[in-house]
Amino acid sequence: MVAKTLYDKLWDAHLVHESDDGSALIYIDRHIVHEVTSPQAFDGLRMAGRKPWRVDSILATPDHNVPTTQKERAHGVSGIQDPVSLIQVQTLDDNCDEFGITEFKINDSRQGIVHVVGPESGACLPGMTIVCGDSHTATNGALGALAHGIGTSEVEHVMATQCLVAKKMKNMLIKVDGTLGLGVTPKDVVLAIIAKIGTAGGTGYAMEFGGQVFRDMSMEGRLTVCNMAIEAGARAGMVAVDQTTIDYVKGRPYAPSGDVWEQAVANWRELVSDEGAHFDAVIEIDGASIRPQVSWGTSPEMVVSVEDKVPDPANEPDPVKRKDMIRALEYMGLQANQPITSIYVDRVFIGSCTNSRIEDIRAAAEVVKGKQKAANVKEAIVVPGSGVVKAQAEAEGLDKIFTAAGIEWREPGCSMCLAMNADKLGAGEHCASTSNRNFEGRQGYGGRTHLVSPAMAAAAAIAGHFVDVRSFN
């Protein structure tokens, strides 16, 4: 028997048909839907007189456009002030009602960011193929699933046929061994990976994360890492199933139970790469060498340790990269060789599909407990990834820790990750952000994003500038 990678196994299990040109038809188990990339797909179904092939495979929730203040959320959809956002959220409600699709609506206690809701509800499970009209669908690969984003036309195709036309990707293994140091988090690990291989390093690959660091990592940490596989250029990221995976899934609302659970677990335990399986590329990193990371530029690969200085373009031999660095420094308002710890922040955002789960909230609360937000920080907000996360955090009293420190506690949503709702940066403002992208204008026109872990963001909120969280307390 030929040894297979985890990706090979997931692909083969869902292969419906393969053509001579290499294109294939893949069966899709779970389809997650939000308000931004679904309206045209529903219109397409309606115009063709079709219905979703498997309504029970679809789960919807609004996230990108929803407001996160209690004032706006108190009145449900009608309370949304932005007219475009209101239309998008209302349209999702109407479409789901018409086609009989399960939706966690804006004031449902289960509503949240699609990539948080899927795993925590058990709607996304090991061994599944999972798609959504959102590139960060790769998050779900942490469960030992094949998960990736699709375009709006593909959203319609999957609804109509339960299948997707695709080409098989190559296999890449990111192996991180050793032990992470104190204060080094999964977010730091994935930022360090991107810094090493670049934002195009994983292009054309399905990326498996392996090694001791990932075996020791919590499920929520793995979700953070797989979330940013797309920033490393890969379309999909994944981690092999182990006891951590199974313990995480057990008892969740949509997870199997009884005899079906036992059968499922037996199948899931096979979702590992076989010994001797071929990877087209292998990247090895020493986990002990990773330090808390801070992005300084306008690409996720423009990242260094908090101990370092802003890189000098003069030291970059590649003329294209040098030009990009010069542009990034100009946009970010930084100087070459400036210590990272000298960068002051105007706003702090703790949230997004990367870092808004309960472990992230706890880590941030631990840093700010008993302290006060710095006077120069105009705003610091904590936005839980779902109503479930919010309720858990409040049960633990974490919300009160933040509010006592002068940090706002918000309602679930994508929030300041992207400038599609009321939470935005002003031009020239620096933000310590736990999100996944630091492109020009990503958080608002002229906004300057610095990607960090929840603990590092929390420390910046208190200090007013970037500090090494390892020595902060």
From Swiss-Prot:
Tell me the GO BP annotations in alphabetical order.
Answer: L-leucine biosynthetic process
What the entry lists under Gene3D superfamilies is as follows: Aconitase, domain 3
Which sequence ranges form a coiled-coil region, renumbered to this chain? none
Catalyzed reactions? (2R,3S)-3-isopropylmalate = (2S)-2-isopropylmalate
Q: What is its EC number?
A: 4.2.1.33
Q: How is the cofactor bound?
A: Binds 1 [4Fe-4S] cluster per subunit.
Instruction: State if Nucleotide-binding is listed as a keyword.
Output: no
User: So where does [4Fe-4S] cluster get bound?
Assistant: 353, 414, 417
Q: Would the keyword 4Fe-4S turn up in this protein's UniProt record?
A: yes
Supply the alphabetized keyword list.
4Fe-4S, Amino-acid biosynthesis, Branched-chain amino acid biosynthesis, Iron, Iron-sulfur, Leucine biosynthesis, Lyase, Metal-binding
User: What are this entry's molecular-function GO terms?
Assistant: 3-isopropylmalate dehydratase activity; 4 iron, 4 sulfur cluster binding; metal ion binding
Q: In which pathway does it act?
A: Amino-acid biosynthesis; L-leucine biosynthesis; L-leucine from 3-methyl-2-oxobutanoate: step 2/4
Q: Which Pfam families match?
A: Aconitase
Cofactor(s) for this UniProt protein: [4Fe-4S] cluster
What SUPFAM superfamilies does this protein's entry cite? Aconitase iron-sulfur domain
Q: Return the broad EC class.
A: lyase
Superkingdom field: Bacteria
What is its biological role? Catalyzes the isomerization between 2-isopropylmalate and 3-isopropylmalate, via the formation of 2-isopropylmaleate.
- Family label: Belongs to the aconitase/IPM isomerase family. LeuC type 1 subfamily.
The protein's assembly and partners? Heterodimer of LeuC and LeuD.
**Protein name from the UniProt record:** 3-isopropylmalate dehydratase large subunit
